[in-house]
From Swiss-Prot:
Keywords: DNA-binding, Transcription, Transcription regulation. InterPro entries: Sig_transdc_resp-reg_C-effctor, Tscrpt_reg_LuxR_C, WH-like_DNA-bd_sf. SUPFAM superfamilies: C-terminal effector domain of the bipartite response regulators (SSF46894). This is HTH-type transcriptional regulator AlkS. May act as a transcriptional regulator of AlkB. PANTHER family: DNA-BINDING TRANSCRIPTIONAL ACTIVATOR DEVR_DOSR. Pathway: Hydrocarbon metabolism; alkane degradation. Residues 840-859 bind DNA. Pfam families: GerE (PF00196). Residues 816-881 form the HTH luxR-type domain. Gene3D superfamilies: Winged helix-like DNA-binding domain superfamily/Winged helix DNA-binding domain. The lineage of its organism: Bacteria, Pseudomonadati, Pseudomonadota, Gammaproteobacteria, Pseudomonadales. GO terms for biological process: alkane catabolic process; regulation of DNA-templated transcription.
Length: 883
């Protein structure tokens, strides 16, 4: 949706309306028009209510509606009810005055003894008697509806809305729902709440453009919108000042806004309630009453949620409420400033409340804030399952259990198992295995934790986190056969681990099968944490295949999937951020702030499994190289290599070293003998041999081309392409095709080079690994100067689609898309050119092949799609989502 700025030069029908037009126009100055908030025409409800806390643009939306109505020549009334002294008489008189200006009603020639209506119900009756008001659609805007008006006046307004002619419509802005129940019941009201009024990323970008804010990228804006949950006024403040690195609530403008517009506007008792509520993760009447030893929580919650919308319902939990996170930070600052001595005491009461109710996730988080870790020694099996396996509280448990004395830790095997699980996911496998050493014994039916095989399961999955995939797969399958029937939670975890292993090893057919099993078991066992890891496995498949738009789609699904609860814990949300880095880089939308990089690098240093660790480091290295920071590019890879050596992760070490060798080519160093010796390493004969060999062959090809050994370089590139195709690694295949083209151009076989460049570009366009193409072509042109001419002949922007995200076609992986599984990349490319109206001869020229080859491809396409003509082929391919 394109956002546009409304012109404020509006025609005015009557001179008496100049004042109102000026007033309303001022309200939209430097604001953006959001069409999605407009009042729908036709059969839509007659009343549109904009209801949200301060700063959500309610009045702005209302003003735009008034102006939109006036620009079409239709009458519009504007009433602001901010003054607490407003009476029904005042409102009635103001409406009449404005309607008379439009000659919709007239009371100047009524018979003697009859006065103008002073009550809204009488005005409604008068409007029915007016011919003009029944014919012309009129909009009445009521701004600042609030609980201070009192129920009698609110009810009178609602009755007026219901009893006026249908040609009169209403737009209302305020922060209360009081008095609107009849309108809701009658189906006469369309409501835009806080969620609707929040800025989308596109709208925030439009605001930046409207106010000519410089130095803020779209990715930064998107992150800001996500962090602010779209609160327009906060986003506006932050865009006008330097974006803070720490707490946003400490920004002076935001602090002042919260204090003046929200905090000081509340009665004292509700200010106290809000400050206290900021200490709780979720606010419930019983929980608040227990923690703060009072009895009035229910009435305060009702008042603040109904009249100010400052407390929001937790989705799916109507009895639970939360505060906006930035407002909560502001209120917590007040709480600790006013009463720092009570901090620990109140937090412990809150933690105990959740603990007593079995809400251990909340209890642990609050207990950590209170620096109280004593409860860990009393954890039962149920709690360990909930926290470790179902909830995935890795970060929280690591901090908590690390504080326990060793003697207390060893008193409870369940706590020990839990800690080992956490350590494995924190890349501390040696320490984890030391804890499990005495627990991995033959099952003892007297010990429930042994009977269900918890130590063996943690050990099996832990091996995968340490990149020992073969052993982990063997142990997981063995565990499922021994314990799977009696331990659903454990079985779900083991199947999820297998899914991750298969994704890492490019075993995509096996991955599809185990994903179906894992999803079914995890759903039955309520395994929220495992669902997050299943998304990670799918993401690994998408990234390994090079399908970046599919990866992007999966990330969006993961973040919005309430069943997976990925955003509920820091561990899984940061894992998603780390995986997102590669897709954002390829789609040319990377957040390049060092702060963002630092956060992700810190996370992978503590929790990064090999595939995630390498993905992040490779992207950061490539980005730095693109900025001509060769030393910085190598530095991050050297860090990854040193980390791998420290943690005994040979695959990570080898992949990092291969990338380092590629960077060293810029300095004229080839290490060709060392590269050949790499193939003798044990890791090259394991399950990851194909992608490792492909990466090594690519660097060898580049090194040979640099030494002008073009024949052997082309041979190495072909071998890399074969390895990539064997495992469906599209991104590696694109690189191989470009390296092959570079070697062919260097050797003088230009036509073959052109053919492979065209093929690589078409493949990259479909996969949407755009940055790979840009990076590799820049590298090839620098190392093989004779290839510059053939690459210069390619219009990259046109070939790849100008890298414009809105123009990108999503590559969706759906059950219906059967043909996409059988049509080759070349055949899909042929179909796209057919759709553009190209003849077989034109297609052959563009793809650097013979016309007979195109005819052969068309026959295959007809067979696979079961069609008889080119037109039918296009229709069927579009229906199945192939093109």
């Amino acid at each position: 949706m394109k956002i546009k700025i409304i012109n404020n030069d509006f025609p005015v029908a009557k001179i008496g309306l100049d004042r109102i037009t000026t007033l309303v126009s001022a309200k939209v100055h430097n604001c953006i028009y959001r069409p999605r908030l407009s009042i729908a025409d036709g059969t839509a409800p007659r009343v549109c209510l904009y209801r949200a806390p301060p700063g959500y643009g309610k009045t702005v939306a209302l003003a735009f509606e008034w102006l939109r109505h006036r620009t079409t020549g239709r009458p519009a009334v504007w009433i602001s009810l901010r003054a607490s002294s407003y009476s029904e008489f005042d409102i009635c008189a103001e409406i009449i005055e404005q309607l008379e200006a439009f000659e919709l009603v007239t009371f100047s020639h009524v018979r003697e003894g009859v006065s103008k209506p002073t009550l809204l119900r009488d005005l409604a009756s008068s409007l029915w008697q007016s011919t003009s008001s029944n014919e012309i659609e009129t909009l009445i805007c009521l701004d600042n509806i609030n609980q201070g008006l009192g129920l009698p006046l609110l009810h009178a307004l609602m009755e007026f809305m219901l009893e006026t002619p249908k040609s009169i419509r209403f737009a209302v802005a305020g922060n209360t729902i009081k008095g609107f129940s009849r309108l809701k019941l009658a189906g006469a009201m369309q409501e835009h709440t806080e969620k609707d009024l929040a800025f989308s990323a596109d709208e925030a970008v439009a605001l930046v453009e409207a106010e000519a804010v410089l130095g803020v990228s779209e990715v930064q804006i998107e992150a800001l919108v996500q962090e602010m949950e779209g609160w327009p006024v906060l986003i506006g403040f932050l865009l006008k000042c330097e974006l803070p690195a720490k707490s946003i609530s400490t920004v002076v403008e935001i602090d002042n806004y919260f204090n003046d517009e929200i905090f000081e506007a509340l009665p004292e008792r509700y200010r106290v309630f809000l400050v206290n509520s900021s200490l709780l993760d979720v606010v419930t009447p019983d929980g608040y009453n227990y923690v703060f030893k009072c009895v009035n929580a229910a009435s305060c919650i009702k008042y603040l949620s109904t009249n100010y919308m400052l407390l929001r319902h937790v989705e799916g939990e109507p009895a639970q409420f939360t505060l906006h996170p930035v407002l909560r930070d502001f209120l917590q600052g007040i709480a600790w400033a006013e009463n720092p001595a009570k901090r620990s005491y109140l937090l412990k009461r809150a933690a105990f409340w959740h603990w007593r109710r079995g809400e251990y996730q909340y209890a642990i988080r609050i207990a950590l804030r209170a620096n109280d870790c004593r409860w860990a020694v009393g954890m039962s099996e149920g709690i360990i399952l909930d926290l470790s396996f179902r909830q995935g509280e890795i970060d929280t448990l690591r901090h908590w259990l690390s504080e326990l004395p060793v003697k207390d830790l060893h008193k409870n095997p369940i706590v020990l198992i839990c800690f080992a699980w956490v350590l494995y996911f924190s890349q501390q496998s040696a320490r984890a295995e030391k804890l499990l050493k005495d627990l991995i014994t033959p099952p003892d039916k007297k010990n429930k934790w042994q009977e269900k095989g918890w130590p063996q399961l943690v050990f099996a999955i832990g091996k995968a986190t340490n990149d020992e995939m073969l052993l982990s797969e063997e142990l997981c399958n063995k565990w499922i056969s021994l314990f799977g029937d009696s331990n659903a939670v454990g079985k779900g975890a083991a199947l999820t681990c297998l899914a991750f292993i298969f994704a890492s090893e490019y075993r995509f057919a096996e991955l599809e099968k185990v994903l179906a099993q894992a999803q079914a078991v995890n759903k039955f066992a309520k395994q929220d944490f495992a669902f997050g890891w299943l998304y990670v496995a799918k993401l690994q498949q998408a990234l390994a295949s090079g399908k970046m738009s599919w990866a992007r789609q999966l990330i969006t699904q993961a973040r919005t999937d309430s069943g997976a609860q990925i955003m509920e814990t820091a561990f899984t949300s940061k894992m998603l951020d780390a995986l997102e880095l590669e897709s954002n880089y390829e789609l040319c939308r990377l957040d390049t702030s060092e702060e963002k990089f630092s956060e992700i690098l810190e996370f992978i240093a503590n929790h990064g499994v090999t595939d995630v660790f390498f993905s992040v480091c490779r992207v950061v290295s490539a980005w730095r190289l693109g900025r001509n920071d060769l030393n910085g590019s190598i530095e991050i890879l050297e860090w990854a290599k040193a980390y791998a050596a420290e943690k005994n992760l040979p695959r990570l070490e080898v992949m990092s070293q291969i990338e380092i060798y590629q960077r060293l080519l810029f300095q004229g160093v080839t290490y060709i003998n060392t590269l050949q010796a790499f193939e003798d390493r044990k890791i090259f004969s394991g399950p990851h041999s194909a992608p490792l060999k492909a990466r090594l062959l690519l660097v060898q090809s580049l090194a040979l081309s640099r030494d002008q050994n073009f024949h052997l370089a082309a041979h190495r590139a072909l071998l890399a392409i074969q390895q990539a195709r064997k495992i469906s690694a599209g991104q590696l295949e694109v690189r191989g095709l470009l390296y092959l083209a570079g070697a062919q151009a260097g050797g003088g076989t230009l036509k073959k080079a052109q053919h492979n460049i065209a093929y690589a570009l078409e493949m990259a366009k479909q996969l949407q690994c755009f940055q790979t193409v840009l990076d590799e072509i820049r590298l090839i042109k620098r190392l093989i100067p004779t290839s510059c001419e053939v690459f210069a002949a390619v219009n990259l922007d046109q070939a790849i689609g100008a890298f414009s995200l809105p123009q990108m076609v999503e590559i969706r992986k759906s059950a219906e898309n059967k043909a996409g599984d059988f049509l080759t990349l070349k055949q899909v490319s042929v179909l796209k050119l057919v759709k553009e109206g190209c003849s077989n001869k034109q297609i052959a020229t563009k793809m650097y092949v013979t016309e007979d080859a195109i005819k052969w491809h068309m026959r295959k396409i007809f067979t696979i799609l079961n069609v008889k003509s080119r037109t039918q082929a296009i229709i069927e391919a579009e229906r199945q989502g192939v093109i």
